[in-house]
Amino acid sequence: MRLHLAAILILCIEHVTKAVAQGMPISPCPKVFQYRFDGSEWFGLMAVRSPDGHQPLHIRVTLSMRGKPTTYTQNYLGEIELLTRGKFTHNAPVLYKIRFPKHHFPPKLLLMSANNHVICFGSGEHSIFMTQIQLEHIRKLSFIPDKKSSLLLDPEEEEVRKTDDKPPSTPHIQFKKKPFAQAPKEICGRIDRDLDFHLSQRTESLHVAIGEPKSSDGITSPVFVDDDEDDVLEHQFVDESEAEAIESDSADSLPSITRGSWPWLAAIYVNNLTSLDFQCGGSLVSARVVISSAHCFKLFNKRYTSNEVLVFLGRHNLKNWNEEGSLAAPVDGIYIHPDFNSQLSSYDADIAVIILKDEVRFNTFIRPACLWSGSSKTEYIVGERGIVIGWSFDRTNRTRDQKLSSELPGKKSTDASAPKVVKAPIVGNAECFRANAHFRSLSSNRTFCAGIQAEERDTHQSGASIYTGISGAGLFIRRNNRWMLRGTVSAALPAVETPDAESSHKLCCKNQYIIYADVAKFLDWITAFVI
């Protein structure tokens, strides 16, 4: 008897020690997700507002817990249960119960989304062995137009609901595959008319703030622009040759970037178990296809899979996870060009196609760019100025501006969480090789070289190469009032030491060059995924 009591006491002490060591998780978003205890087990309580009453509500929850999954845990990974039944008003929250795996402690919430819109984002566990669980739930809900609370159930409706089958809930539900759809010609490469601009504008109009689009719904259908409407807009801008004559020598002809001005910009994140980290940029070219660089997903012995990658569309400020009209798009597949070899120094065929699980709805902030059309010969674009846009994050997920500011006293950090846009004059290989002989080994007949024409204020304020962290970003050239994707960023010239003895930090030379994968050389391969 005494031995039995001692064994029980040891088990109790062990459980208490584990609880103190691990600690009970705290909800990262207590307004929409809370941990509850019913006396026997822990569960999660989630409140979600349906973003669109005409579509099924698709809930996705990603959980993180310490250790390897046990046999008992593998048999039951948890589930999402719809708590509130009956009809809902559009503004009323829908309540869900998150049942956790049979484990001593509830897992931490890593990500929660509704119809691909991230509504809660947290950090995972920190341990040598980690287990991630993804739960999904899809249900078509009935909505009523009146303002009665959805939590006050109709007794007759409740009786009907009791006879219904259990709501479909499975840890790994299969998405219904939709056919790939090429971007409509009316949309691709065009910007909402309220945000549209040409590469070169009159200097006096550069500092006029561009307002947000006058749309009350961030996920409405796009505004189509007919060919004859371009003539109506043309009088607002001047020809590039005319604009260059009145530009100042400080290269300040680029407008301040606003949200929605580059709606095909994609932010690609990778799941590193404990957090989502920014990895690369990308370019949306259809409702399901994003183009990026191969080295973003395959470098030496590391290869990211589709389950480890999440693509954000419609994003501008990467610190703001709740931007209207943006969405988090799960990835169905990552296809790296078969000729790409991460073990070699050459960046030949450094291109990848990311296929999204679901087609995205185009809106003011999410639109595709056009794939290149016309000749694929590089010599035909030498001398032209393209546009490169992307976020300049390094691999530690700090912006290069912030990193420099922490190292240099008196330097103020600029907001590099927003994308930066720069001009990229396309040059021949000879000029590129003269700038840096190492580019000869990096390039091939399927790459081209372009410079970075930085604005003076960026060069002096940031004092660092803010343009070398934009792997996967696209280089766009305007053709017939449309922006066309011609290249993706592969390799940049390393920063050089400044001759100024007082400044020991590295500066990006004003005439920096970057190697791009020539998208025009891979159109046949890309089109196979788009059609």
Swiss-Prot record:
Quote the SUPFAM superfamilies the UniProt record gives: Trypsin-like serine proteases
List, from the UniProt record, the residues annotated as the active site of this protein. H295, D350, S471
Origin, by domain of life?
A: Eukaryota
Q: Give the UniProt tissue specificity note.
A: Expression begins in previtellogenic stages and is seen in germline-derived nurse cells of the germarium. Expression continues throughout oogenesis with transcripts from the nurse cells accumulating in the oocytes. Most abundant in the ovaries, the level of protein decreases from the moment of egg laying and is essentially gone by 4 hours.
Provide the Peptidase S1 domain boundaries: 246-531
Q: Which InterPro entries match?
A: GD_N, Peptidase_S1_PA, Peptidase_S1_PA_chymotrypsin, Trypsin_dom
Q: Which residues are glycosylated?
A: N272, N397, N445
Q: Which Pfam families match?
A: GD_N (PF16030), Trypsin (PF00089)
Q: Which biological process annotations from GO are given for this protein? A: dorsal/ventral axis specification; dorsal/ventral pattern formation; proteolysis; Toll receptor ligand protein activation cascade; ventral furrow formation; zymogen activation
Q: What are the GO MF terms of this UniProt record?
A: serine-type endopeptidase activity
**Cited Gene3D superfamilies:** Trypsin-like serine proteases
Secretion signal: which residues? Answer: 1-19
Stretches the record annotates as Disordered: 155-174
Which Enzyme Commission number(s) are listed?
A: 3.4.21.-
Q: Where located? A: Secreted
Q: Does the keyword Protease apply?
A: yes
Q: What disulfide bonds does the UniProt entry report for this chain?
A: C280-C296, C432-C449
Q: Which GO cellular component term is one of those annotated?
A: extracellular region
**Class of this enzyme:** hydrolase
Q: Which UniProt keywords apply?
A: Developmental protein, Disulfide bond, Glycoprotein, Hydrolase, Protease, Secreted, Serine protease, Signal, Zymogen
Report the PTM annotation: Proteolytically activated by the protease ndl.
Q: Family assignment?
A: Belongs to the peptidase S1 family.
Function summary = Component of the extracellular signaling pathway that establishes the dorsal-ventral pathway of the embryo. A protease cascade involving ndl, gd, snk and ea results in activation of the spz Toll receptor ligand; acts downstream of ndl but upstream of snk and ea. Activation of ea requires activation of the ndl-gd-snk protease cascade and sulfation of a vitelline membrane component by pip. Localized activation of the Toll receptor in the ventral region of the embryo defines cell identities along the dorsal-ventral continuum.
The name of this protein is Serine protease gd
Q: Which organism is it from?
A: Drosophila melanogaster
